[in-house]
Amino acid sequence: QASTDEIKIGVILGFTGPIESLTTTMASSAELAMKEVSDSGLLLGGASVSSVRADSTCVDAGAATSAAERLVTSDNVAAIMGADCSGVTTAIANNVAVPNGVTIISPSATSPALTDIDDKGYFFRTAPSDARQGQVLAQVVMDRGISELAVTYTNNDYGKGLSDSFVNAFKAMGGTVTAEVPHEDGKGDYSAEVSTLSASGATEVAVLGYVDQGGRGIIQSSMETGAFSRFILADGMIGDSLIENVDGDLTGTFGTLPGSESEGANMFKAMASSNGIPGDGPFEPESYDAAALIMLAIQAGNSADRSSIANNVMGVANAPGTEIFPGELGKALEILKDGGEVNYQGATNVEFSDVGEASGSYKELEIGNGEFNTIQVR
């Protein structure tokens, strides 16, 4: 049992690897929720919450499993906020979290395959499954009058799951996919992949990869050879580092990212920006919510015991109860202390399915004037 004067929560994200530019503010967003709870003095009668960071690497399942094992055995964390990428999240859930009875809430692992893992009630995610993102992105593409394209995806659980979902949805809407080309992350040269994509005859390409490695490499190589001039992106490609690091004009490039412009999203953005976090960056709201749910579950069960946390996540996430928004965690702790119920809405309108997944909405984004702009929420 975790000590009740200081409760540790693991934050395992890819601080190195193909989405490293996104993870620092994801972690800071989770830690913002922890600070809010610690400062309130209301968790289990005054416990403080501290974050223990660990590196998932995003792509190396062995390294991620070892890092998670250290969190659970040496650091004795009460629960885990993470991981980020789907393959390492699956490995951590199956190899470490579930066998040890540790609740794990991912803010960004979106592979449809995670819906079906035998998680014994310990795995949750505040980002929606890519089964839905594939459909939304296909609709966005169709609505823009694009009926033919090539697809490249990062060759892992995330990329394959999203590509299947997107391609099937696009074809069902009458679209034509001229090529599906997997790519590996961490390569120095992507000209072969770009040449295959281009040779398929498509003038548009969907890049379902990672913003700091393979996906960006595909885009850079496409710009250099003139193969493609704008790109269709999914969530793993959305980030300011793309605009900063690609040599060329990305105006008109568009894509999807889980998110909304709801009351909760705006409240989180205001709170985050006063703490030096953008607040509407990729998976920042989902990270705040994931950490918040862990702490509310601790309070609801009146215990930082690992098994108690898992049993209480659903109860605080869904109706019935008082709706709770970002910045209102103290209020939620007070209600739970008095035996009341909360329905945590948070920054992302949290509502879990019976397997602990967010349904979620998506922002359609487009690059213009050197930044990502929200076109609409779907």
What residue spans do the PLM features occupy?
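Extracytosolic ligand-binding ectodomains
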Residues: Q1-R378
